[in-house]
């Protein structure tokens, strides 16, 4: 209802500024508005025994923000990871978030995002292998990463959710593998890791000419289109500000509530921080805790929009 009501007005505001939205964004909204509606097509399912018929509306199958399709994909992803991908070993979640300027850069440059993920993966993998006491030439670890682009307030916040095996495999001379489990990272180790990650990421961006540092400050060197509406929208979203309309530039009003069970379970204070980089590693599952692991997989693969968290006040505010 909210999208259907305000999407045309939003497009009109953008066009009046002589700005444009990328085609994939417009398509995401338009197909979402057709999702689950019988008038846009359906399948007729009929039971062979009782002859009961049921109509199933076509879905948009988009990956942006459709709550229905996103929830279905969340369940499928979690089942796949637990049943077919993640081994029956201890698993730890590592969550890395970035400074505001880098969130903007990563949101607009998938090639850079891929390179940064590779840097982060190597830093954590090397740490696990060394801590396991195994030679690098004989050791392997593993991880699955889900990149989330949203925060709890639907703000733009590119960050990594990485599920690492909590240890390393050692390949013996006979070809067999032996697993070496490691202890949870200490506060000192987290600070060391996040410092290494920040230095290597910044160094890579400088070599690519995307980040310029002088004696006083650092800034991004980006070639941006002035008529691209997404640039302005992303800049405001990252800093929790209203992007268009009469209240443009104002901070979004937010309420701090009692943490949900997800926040309580998956948001501990085991964290290392430096210069806007933040590395969490306080959540882990034991070998036999497959149900907890599935809950964790559902949590990190959840869609951006949760209809349970949306409500309209009597004044019409969201």
Walk through the language-model features, giving the residues of each.
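Beta->alpha loop/short-helix hinge microenvironment recognizer with preference
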Residues: 1-318
């Amino acid at each position: 209802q909210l999208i259907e009501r305000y999407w045309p007005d939003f497009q009109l505001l953008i066009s009046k500024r002589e700005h444009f939205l990328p085609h994939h964004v417009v398509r995401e909204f338009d197909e979402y508005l057709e999702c689950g509606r019988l008038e846009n097509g359906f399948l007729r399912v009929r039971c062979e025994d009782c002859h009961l018929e049921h109509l199933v509306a076509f879905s948009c199958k988009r990956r942006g923000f459709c709550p229905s399709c996103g929830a279905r994909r969340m369940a499928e992803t979690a089942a796949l990871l637990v049943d077919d991908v993640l081994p029956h070993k201890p698993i730890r979640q590592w969550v890395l978030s970035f400074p505001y300027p880098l969130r903007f850069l990563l949101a607009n440059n998938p090639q850079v995002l891929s390179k940064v993920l590779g840097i982060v993966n190597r830093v954590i993998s090397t740490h696990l292998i060394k801590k396991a006491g195994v030679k690098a030439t004989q050791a392997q670890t593993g991880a699955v990463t889900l990149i989330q682009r949203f925060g709890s307030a639907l703000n733009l916040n590119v960050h990594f959710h990485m599920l690492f095996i909590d240890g390393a495999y050692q390949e013996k001379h006979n070809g067999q593998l032996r697993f070496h489990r490691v202890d949870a990272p200490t506060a000192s180790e987290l600070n060391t890791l996040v410092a290494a990650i920040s230095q290597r990421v910044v160094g890579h961006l400088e070599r690519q000419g995307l980040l310029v540092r002088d004696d006083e400050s650092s800034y991004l060197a980006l070639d941006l289109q002035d008529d691209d509406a997404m640039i302005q929208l992303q800049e405001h979203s990252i800093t929790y500000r209203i992007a268009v309309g009469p209240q443009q530039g104002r901070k979004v009003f937010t309420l701090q509530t009692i943490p949900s069970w997800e926040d309580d379970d998956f948001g501990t204070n085991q964290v290392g921080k430096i210069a806007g980089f933040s590395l969490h590693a306080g959540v882990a599952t034991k070998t036999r805790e497959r149900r907890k692991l599935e809950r964790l997989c559902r949590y990190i693969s959840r869609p951006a929009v949760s209809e349970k968290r949306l409500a309209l006040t009597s004044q019409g505010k969201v």
